[in-house]
Amino acid sequence: MERFDELLRGMDLEFFGRGSHKISIEKALDLHSRGEAFILDIRSEKENRLISLGFAASIPANEIPDRLEEIPHGVTIAILCTSSVRASVVYAYMLLKGYEKARVMAEGLKDIAGTIKPGYVRKYKMKPKEDLK
């Protein structure tokens, strides 16, 4: 709990003002296309069945502690969910677990879907889920 206290103390106005805890969908997909990011969809399995994102690895938030070994170190971890509430919780958890490049996806699912259009997909050559492992 002491580590969480320290983490929280560092999240002051300056921290949030810099925005370094966030990443845009455009930046995340750019890094992902170069193998420099792991896009982590933390929505529930049921939510993922309704709307699946082929470029993201799906690990529900409540399963993260048991599946942490599936998440690589050394690359940016772009955490996404329907909004940023769950992503923010997982972000803090990931930082405490040593994932210094964890980031919260700035956009919600609605905005992400609006970004991914044919020209965008072609430009960034998104990798399908099978290539994420």
Residue ranges with predicted function:
Residues 1-38, 45-76, 85-133:
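Rhodanese-like catalytic fold shared by cysteine-dependent sulfurtransferases
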Residues 79-80:
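Short, surface-exposed ligand- or partner-binding patches at beta-edge/loop junctions that are enriched
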